[in-house]
Amino acid sequence: MPKELKDLKDYLNVLKRPDAKSVVVYKKKSKGGLLSTKFKVRCSRYLYTFSVPNQVKAAKVEATIPSNLEKKVISNKKN
């Protein structure tokens, strides 16, 4: 079952856990032209999701991902 994280501190604590395996970053452009970013952290029991609507804040959050975790970036490009 996925769990949604609302707070940045909770997300950072999940990243530091020893059972965190990988992070998938989804970058999706909406119809209004805004870019929303979702971070999905795979742990042993749950998949934790943290979404950021602000592009500048999302870049800062993406920089906090530890190097020992596998990181995969998926961007949705629509013409």
Curated annotation (Swiss-Prot):
InterPro entries, sorted: Ribosomal_eL38, Ribosomal_eL38_sf
Highest taxon, organism lineage: Eukaryota
Keywords: Ribonucleoprotein, Ribosomal protein
GO molecular function, one term: structural constituent of ribosome
Coiled-coil ranges per UniProt: none
GO terms under biological process: protein-RNA complex assembly; translation
GO cellular component, one term: cytosolic large ribosomal subunit
Pfam families per the UniProt record, alphabetical: Ribosomal_L38e
Family: Belongs to the eukaryotic ribosomal protein eL38 family.
Protein name (record): Large ribosomal subunit protein eL38
Organism: Theileria annulata
